[in-house]
Design a protein with these regions (language model features):
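Fungal secretory targeting signals
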Residues: 1-26
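CBM-like carbohydrate-recognition segments
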Residues: 26-131, 140-146, 182, 203-204, ...
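Extended glycan-interaction surfaces of carbohydrate-active proteins
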Residues: 59-67, 234, 283-316, 529
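Structural signature of alpha-solenoid helical repeat junctions
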Residues: 84-87, 140-143, 147-150, 185, ...
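Alpha-helical scaffold segments in carbohydrate-active enzymes
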Residues: 94, 127, 150, 157, ...
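Alpha-solenoid helical repeat scaffolds
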Residues: 97-105, 154, 161-168, 203, ...
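Fungal eukaryote-biased detector of long internal structured cores
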Residues: 138, 149, 153-281, 286-288, ...
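Outer-membrane beta-barrel proteins
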Residues: 319-320
């Protein structure tokens, strides 16, 4: 086998990409923040120029997130908690995918530009590798089932990116040499995803409520939306994207062995059953939004260990509505369609998205709370009170991450995969119908991205309450709004338990109050800006 040096590969890669048309490639500025040198300069259409502005916003948000919050020595975001760090890592991997996916290199390239892109990608990819070692895995192994499943989704996102980038990097050429170096991380990422998937799978319980995942092994049974959505999303993502794992540590048994395979039917089965259970659980409200979850009336564990199962049914509903509970299900819907070809999964997703958009008031942009936002912009209920917890600050970004995945066009490798998994392959008409529905969300997405952008401060950091522009002139109006809203009787925001205190409603920009700007709020902006980049690059 002929071995090629890295330099030879790059030269041949560049040669392959020498301009076919007279158009010049996007040039990459060495410093993405240098206003004198826009990131992309192109002779292409206005649409492309516009989407390159969106890409610039994505890169700026990512750079500020990593420079401000990521601690390279520790390999993690120092102020994050374990699950929000797992989500931050997912955003970084998904953003890399979005950047590379959206770049149209096919119209010709200049080698130095490509080398600079390579450097941008490698910089952040290396940081995800640092995080592999910085992630608090020993603690996470004993946390709630949803915590474990965020870990699964994060490392699958990393292997998805590596697979895509390795293919893209080769650009159709078959190099008789070692593949893209980043693939070295994938077996480790796959191993971690597999181990945490197995740890979480024991949360499935049929002794109560005829099924469903339990949220937390050490608390009274609570079957909530997020854990079930995560189990459905993680199961179908394992089925589709898990590249296999030959590392049997930390244990191997006959039951666990089944989970090591690629396209494992056990993963598909878990996805179908948890998706179905959740859909039929009665967890949605009249607006069609997922509420938080079910307790079992009367369930009790006596000190001697005896359990009184109470009614044994999911009959005590926590009616709080959060943005992230409308998001993760979308990845499950998309994956189940890809794995089965069944249109109903896509319809479920579009219905949920439509309900969310309606619950922001859109296209109405007045100041009245509509259930999940106001002014056409997504909000957490806690946003207006400036008391969102670290959990609450993470939610909107999760929604947009999964919305973007839901509407991400299929790559050629995914179409091939579907052809192998679904008899006859995917129905093109259904796929095009799906893309058309996705395209129709663009205005709402731009509206939300622009609202998030308006919260950006001089350091490039974003706030949590997207409806309040940075240094707003209308501060008195916002302050009155902040104390002006209450939850329906009997609903308690247990994820953001702080009461509005006068110390939160002090001075300064509203988005600096409460917990202020954090890696979590930054990741939320990153996600919505990336959605804008995807919609502009793909759908306009
Ligand atoms: C593109 O950008 C121009 C100038 O910023 C703006 O007027 C136009 O509406 C944008 N087009 C789209 C499709 O966003
Ligand atoms: C696992 O080992 C088998 C047999 O050696 C090999 O074919 C396969 O590619 C390996 N899978 C992974 C993910 O390394
Ligand atoms: C455990 O305690 C409960 C409540 O005191 C009692 O009803 C039950 O019989 C006890 N079970 C055992 C096995 O002792
Ligand atoms: C606050 O609530 C009162 C009573 O519902 C309403 O009249 C007022 O307009 C609200 N203020 C704002 C800023 O929304």
């Amino acid at each position: 086998m002929r071995k090629l040096s890295a330099a030879t590969i790059l030269v041949s890669l560049c040669a392959h990409l020498t301009p076919v048309a007279a158009t010049r490639i996007p040039a990459v500025a060495p410093h993405v923040n240098d206003p004198q040198r826009p990131l992309l300069e192109t002779a292409r259409t206005a649409t492309f120029r516009n989407s390159s502005e969106a890409l610039q916003d994505v890169l700026d948000a990512l750079e500020a997130m990593q420079e401000t919050y990521f601690d390279k020595f520790a390999g993690t975001w120092g102020d994050a908690i374990d699950w929000t760090a797992a989500v931050a890592g997912t955003h970084v991997s998904a953003t890399l995918t979005g950047i590379v996916d959206g770049l149209d290199l096919s119209f010709g390239g200049v080698c130095s530009d490509l080398l600079q892109w390579e450097n941008v990608v490698n910089q952040y990819y290396t940081q995800t590798a640092f995080f592999y070692f910085g992630e608090n895995v020993f603690a996470l192994r004993n946390q709630a089932f949803d915590d474990m499943l965020w870990v699964v989704l994060g490392w699958l996102e990393s292997t998805k990116f590596a697979d895509m980038y390795a293919r893209r990097h080769e650009n159709g050429q078959e190099f008789e040499t070692s593949p893209w170096h980043g693939l070295q991380l994938s077996p480790m990422a796959a191993h971690r995803a597999r181990v945490f998937y197995e740890l979480a799978s024991v949360g499935w319980d049929e002794s109560l409520c005829n099924g469903g995942m339990t949220w937390n092994p050490s608390l009274n049974p609570y079957k909530n939306a997020i854990t079930n959505e995560l189990f459905a999303a993680a199961s179908i993502s394992m089925y589709l994207y898990f590249p296999g794992d030959n590392n049997s540590a930390p244990f191997i048994s006959s039951t666990q062995e089944q989970y090591h395979k690629v396209h494992n039917p056990a993963h598909l089965e878990n996805a179908v059953k948890s998706y179905k259970w959740l859909k039929e659980s009665g967890m949605r409200n009249q607006a069609g939004l997922y509420q938080d979850g079910f307790h079992v009336t009367g369930w009790h564990r006596f000190p001697n260990g005896t359990i009184n199962p109470g009614t044994g049914h999911c009959d005590d509903l926590d009616r709080m509505v959060y943005t992230y509970n409308q998001g993760v299900m979308l990845t499950a819907s998309r994956g189940l369609w890809l794995a089965t070809g069944a249109r109903s999964y896509l319809d479920d997703g579009h219905e949920l998205i439509t309900n969310v958009i309606r619950a922001t008031g859109w296209p109405n942009t007045d100041n009245i709370w509509r259930g999940l936002g106001r002014g056409g912009t997504l909000e957490e209920f806690c946003d207006h009170g400036l008391y969102c917890s670290q959990d609450g600050q993470t939610f909107k970004g999760i929604f947009f991450l999964h919305l973007t995945e839901f509407c991400r066009p299929l790559r050629a490798s995914e179409k091939d995969m579907a052809f192998r998994l679904v008899v006859g392959g995917l129905d093109d008409q259904i796929y095009h119908y799906h893309l058309e529905r996705c395209a129709a969300y663009s205005k709402w997405i731009y509206h939300n991205a622009d609202a998030a952008l308006a919260t950006k401060n001089q350091a490039g950091l974003f706030g949590m309450w997207w409806n309040v522009p940075y240094q707003t002139a209308h501060i008195a109006e916002w302050e009155s709004l902040a104390g002006n809203q209450s939850l329906p009787a009997g609903v308690f925001d247990h994820r953001n338990p702080a009461l509005i205190s006068s110390s939160l409603i002090s001075s300064g920009d509203p988005n600096d109050r409460g917990r202020g700007r954090t890696v979590e709020t930054q990741s939320g902006a990153l996600a919505v800006l990336r959605a804008k980049w995807q919609w502009q690059a793909v759908y306009s």
